[in-house]
Amino acid sequence: MENSNLFSFFVPLVGLVFSAIIMVLSFLYIQKDSVN
């Protein structure tokens, strides 16, 4: 039961981290493109 609760907490957290990483990568890509 506790494992399932941890899993239901972990999945949205991974999604949030994943979207944050994508935002940072796209931001860095735009910065690099504007510098060039």
Curated annotation (Swiss-Prot):
Transmembrane feature ranges: 10-30
Signal peptide, first to last residue: none
Record InterPro entries: PSI_PsaI, PSI_PsaI_sf
Keywords: Chloroplast, Membrane, Photosynthesis, Photosystem I, Plastid, Thylakoid, Transmembrane, Transmembrane helix
Protein's cellular compartments: Plastid, Chloroplast thylakoid membrane
Any Gene Ontology CC annotation: photosystem I
Family annotation (Pfam families): PSI_8
Membrane topology according to the record: Single-pass membrane protein
Domain of life per record: Eukaryota
GO biological process, one term: photosynthesis
Database matches in HAMAP family: PSI_PsaI (MF_00431)
Entry function: May help in the organization of the PsaL subunit.
Protein family (similarity comment): Belongs to the PsaI family.
Name of the protein in its database record: Photosystem I reaction center subunit VIII
Highest classification ranks of the organism: Eukaryota, Viridiplantae, Streptophyta, Embryophyta, Tracheophyta
Designated gene of the protein: psaI
